[in-house]
A protein has these predicted regions:
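Beta-strand-rich domains and repeat architectures in extracellular enzymes and scaffolds
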Residues: 20-56
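Conserved beta-propeller blade repeats
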Residues: 25-40, 75-93, 114, 119-136, ...
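Active-site-proximal cap/loop segments of hydrolase catalytic domains
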Residues: 468-661
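Predominantly five- to eight-bladed beta-propeller fold
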Residues: 2-9, 55-56, 141-186, 288-291, ...
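Cap/lid segment of the alpha/beta-hydrolase catalytic domain
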Residues: 390-510, 517, 549-558
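Short loop/turn segments that connect beta-strands within beta-propeller blades
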Residues: 62-66, 108-112, 187-191, 233-237, ...
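Structural motif
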Residues: 53-57, 100-104, 146-148, 180-182, ...
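A short beta-strand motif characteristic of beta-propeller blades
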Residues: 17-22, 69-72, 115-118, 192-197, ...
């Protein structure tokens, strides 16, 4: 699909170090285009060297990239911009000082200061205006034992925690018990708030029906591993749930007349989703597609929102997805289920916002050569433009890695991969090679900015990132090949991709390393027990012992059964066979283990077990623990921790792969 790219050359290029990237790259995100298509509101995030903390503000820009300006000044973090139906007011969430620092604010677009509507201790999410502009729906965490968010006395001991539900904790949120996200209705006139939903399950991403009488939201069960569509009566709060409890819901949208809902989901969690139509009058739920060619952008729990479908007319919807690692737009016929590609890019886009005419589509943009900008697709002209240049100067003075996309055939499947090279790559030289393994296992690499690979390439290494069987964006069949086969054919795919790179004269087969996080951490810990070909390994937040992971991870009891084919009692022999812990005594590779201490997804105990096993074996091993770090610490952890993480990863590999750059 792609060949080696060209890069901007600077006379004296700066090093693409973790510190430089994290402090100096800015990120434009969450774009929202006004109803008339004349203005785009978005969030611009950056990190201050003075405070060592991230901040974000609401900006506005014209669709052609002109007249960019900052709208917010008060507060340190702003998010969730949402236009009123008439386009005259912009709602957003602002973090400010005080015991209840999170405010929903309204900014009149014809001039004047933002008005605080209501404040909360927790961060409101998913702002959505009612069709008549009188009310904002949002989501807030509600603790049934402390619904008014009353502060505990400073000298009071922590309360005793009594647990009766299996999903009592969640990564990036910590201990929950019955605290769950609920839909709230806030008066845009006076800030009066009403709790609409009450069942102790998470309700997210509320969408109003065209007549304003019903809200469609996502109900998440078992920490988001399963989800359903919930139709909530605005007057009474009564809830109708659509779809099986063991199913999944990815994206959804009301039809223009409110008679049906188009949604992307599946009857059970099988790593891939398809489109359905739910007719409100008849209650019929009809499958429209079977085995989509792309993966929908369904968002990531606690981090990002889904890219919801938008209507082009009464029948055809436009949706965003990712196929073979590349973002694109497709149309879905809500009657026939016919799918047609509109455009595809060698880039990764996020979100999906359009004006009332559905001609201009604005999304956040990232590629292998840049990141943090906004892209506008003109549907009538068929043209895509990057309308911001926040990081242009950064990449002019700090050239990104060169790259090459390639693929191999193995076991009847095509395995795609990307090779990253130093920006000043010399084909007559000799370079160590690092195998970079993604998480998931249904994650994927593709056409997005990969900071880890960029840092390693800048440090003088070749980095090969691939999508072995089990990866997402290649269809249902490919994704499901990893189920019940962790460390099997996927491992052999990775080795085959590495061997392909090592055939090149500039790749040094005597200096190979492996790096991975989450499922990539599993594969790294698996690798060092299977072979001694790697001279260095970096293992981030691994699954090391399947049996203990099952009972201690926030999703192990559900995800584990789906992936491994049953409970430990049913699959113990297989779990022992496929656990890296079983083979750790064979390891010889110098290994760095990096792990967040508050990781509830792959708990710190997995890293602890691995460290002890390797230490007892006599391996040169180091264990780095990040206090307070969740499984998502690389996306939103303390700035100093993220810089430390990427620096240690690079330094460990440079040391043991003899990189003298």
């Amino acid at each position: 699909m792609a060949t080696t790219t060209t890069t901007i050359k600077a006379e004296a290029p700066s090093r693409l170090t973790p510190e430089h990237a994290i402090y100096d790259l800015r990120t434009a995100a969450t774009p929202r285009i006004s109803p008339n298509g004349k203005r785009i509101a978005f969030v611009l995030g950056e990190t201050s060297r003075e405070t060592d903390k991230p901040s974000s503000h609401i900006w506005i820009i014209d669709p052609d990239g002109a007249n960019a300006r900052q709208l917010t000044r008060t507060g340190t973090s702003h998010s969730s911009p949402a236009w009123s139906p008439d386009g005259q007011t912009l709602a957003f969430v602002s973090q400010r000082d005080g015991a209840k620092p999170n405010a929903i604010c309204l900014l009149p677009m014809d001039g004047g200061e933002a008005r605080e509507l209501v404040r909360h201790r927790a961060m409101p999410g998913s702002l959505a205006w009612s069709p008549d502009g009188s009310t904002l729906a949002c989501t807030l965490p509600v603790d049934p034992e402390n619904p008014r968010e009353e502060e505990r006395a400073k000298d009071a001991p922590p309360p005793v925690r009594v647990v009766r539900r299996i999903d009592y904790k969640q990564d990036n949120r910590g201990f929950l018990n019955d605290t769950r996200m609920q839909v709230m209705l806030v008066s845009a006139e006076n800030g009066e708030i009403r709790q609409l939903t009450r069942e102790a399950v998470d309700h997210t991403e509320p969408q109003w029906s065209p007549d304003g009488r019903t809200i469609a939201a996502k109900v998440s069960n078992r920490n988001g591993m399963h989800s359903q569509l919930a139709l909530v009566d605005v007057a009474t709060g009564a809830v109708e749930v659509v779809g099986p409890e063991d199913g999944v819901l990815a994206t959804w949208a009301w039809s223009r007349d409110g008679s049906f809902i188009l949604f992307d989901g599946e009857d059970r969690n099988i790593a891939y989703t398809d489109y359905f139509r739910y007719d409100l009058a008849s209650g019929e739920r009809r499958r429209l597609t079977d085995d989509l060619p792309f993966s929908s952008e369904s968002g990531f729990p606690t981090i990002s929102s889904p890219a919801q479908p938008v209507w082009l007319d009464d029948r055809i919807a436009l949706v965003h997805g990712i196929e073979h690692g590349a973002s694109g737009l497709w149309t879905i016929d809500s009657e026939s289920g016919d799918v047609a590609e509109v455009v595809q890019w060698e880039a990764t886009h996020a979100g999906l916002s359009t004006d009332l005419s559905a001609n201009l589509i604005v999304q956040a943009w990232s590629s292998l050569e840049g990141t943090g900008e906004l892209a506008v697709f003109d549907r009538a002209a068929g043209e895509t433009r990057i309308i911001t240049s926040f990081n242009e100067a950064f990449f002019a003075e700090t050239p990104p890695a060169k790259w090459e996309a390639f693929s191999i055939q193995r076991g009847g499947e095509m395995i795609e991969a990307w090779l990253f090279m130093p920006h000043d790559f010399d084909p007559t030289g000799s370079y160590p090679v690092v195998l970079d393994v993604h998480g998931g296992p249904h994650g994927n690499y593709g056409y997005s900015f990969n900071l880890g690979a960029q840092v390693m390439a800048d440090a003088g290494m070749l980095v090969v990132a691939s999508n072995p069987r089990g990866s997402g964006t290649y269809g249902r069949h490919f994704a499901n090949l990893v189920r019940g086969d962790w460390g099997g054919e996927d491992w052999l795919d990775l080795l085959a991709v590495l061997d392909e790179v090592l055939e090149r004269p500039y790749a040094d087969a005597d200096r190979t390393g492996i790096y991975g996080y989450s499922y990539g951490g599993y594969m790294t810990s698996w690798a060092i027990g299977q072979t001694d070909r790697f001279k260095a390994a970096v293992c981030g937040a691994p699954v090391f012992d399947m049996e203990s992971f099952y009972g201690t991870s926030d999703i192990g009891h559900d995800f584990g059964e789906e992936q491994w084919g049953g409970t430990p009692q049913e699959r113990m022999a297989w779990m022992i066979e496929r656990s890296p812990a079983t083979y750790a005594h064979k390891a010889k590779t110098p290994t760095l283990i990096v792990h967040g201490e508050a990781d509830e997804r792959c708990p710190i105990g997995q890293g602890e077990q691995m460290f002890v096993a390797l230490k007892k074996t006599g391996v040169d091993v180091e264990f780095v623990r990040y206090p307070g770090g969740s499984h998502l610490m690389l996306r939103g952890g303390p700035v100093s921790h993220r810089i430390d993480y990427y620096t240690r990863v690079s330094d460990w590999l440079r040391k043991y792969l003899a990189v003298d750059r």
